[in-house]
């Protein structure tokens, strides 16, 4: 087993932070570094994966993260239409209120004028509620705007909450931060609440064979910086 210099440095930093560094914990830390493992647990399914990327790839294949769907985006109802008989017009902005669109168009235009940002006219400090009125069919017709066809947009829905996202990367990032909980390999080894994803389980079973742990210790023995820790591990085993 050949352990690179950079990983040895990380191992030494890890060991110096431990009060009583154990061999298994050290070896698990080594596996994290050498195999680039960043375990995460998908709590809903009680499954641990070797990395967030691995979790997303496998869960996507099982259609457990997202589904594609379509939504209609409408422009809203027209302010004036063919059935309109009278309109009330804001002289400051041109905003129009039709008698058949608003339940009470007078109240609507009064409310608008009281807070209209372009209405600078004041009387006794109060916004003047001045507006224009027309029953002329030709004037009314000039305000009719044909409704736009609704737009059809493809979006992505969370398979967990149903929440919509405009893009798949945004949804996946939300899933990663909201539903995948990071764990250390030592935490994975010491827990019994969650099961390991099959390929991750196979990888760990292979890596945790006694012969490979012994090879790990032998590789460290070539570096005097690790001798004090190896001595502790040997004494513990004896």
Curated annotation (Swiss-Prot):
Similarity field: Belongs to the chlamydial CPn_0658/CT_538/TC_0825 family.
InterPro entries in the cross-refs: DUF2709 (IPR024484)
Name under which the protein is recorded: Uncharacterized protein TC_0825
One Pfam family hit: DUF2709
Domain of life: Bacteria
């Amino acid at each position: 087993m050949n352990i690179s210099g950079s990983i040895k440095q990380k191992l030494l930093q890890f060991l110096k932070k431990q009060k009583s560094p154990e061999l298994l914990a050290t070896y698990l830390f080594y596996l994290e570094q050498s195999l680039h493992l960043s375990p995460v647990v998908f709590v809903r399914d009680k499954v641990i994966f070797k990395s967030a990327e691995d979790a997303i790839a496998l869960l996507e294949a099982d259609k457990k993260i997202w589904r594609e769907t379509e939504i209609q985006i409408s422009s809203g109802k027209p302010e004036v239409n063919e059935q309109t008989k009278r309109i009330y017009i804001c002289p400051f902005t041109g905003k129009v209120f039709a008698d058949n669109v608003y339940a009470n168009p007078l109240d609507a235009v009064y409310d608008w004028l009281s807070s209209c940002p372009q209405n600078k006219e004041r009387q006794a400090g109060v916004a003047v509620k001045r507006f224009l009125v027309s029953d002329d069919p030709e004037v009314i017709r000039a305000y009719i705007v044909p409704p736009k066809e609704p737009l059809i947009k493809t979006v992505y829905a969370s398979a967990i909450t149903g929440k919509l996202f405009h893009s798949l990367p945004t949804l996946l990032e939300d899933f990663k931060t909201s539903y995948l909980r990071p764990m250390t390999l030592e935490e994975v080894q010491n827990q019994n609440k969650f099961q390991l994803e099959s390929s991750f389980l196979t990888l760990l079973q292979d890596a945790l064979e006694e012969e490979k742990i012994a090879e790990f210790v032998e590789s460290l023995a070539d570096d005097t910086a690790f001798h004090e820790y190896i001595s502790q591990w040997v004494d513990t085993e004896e």
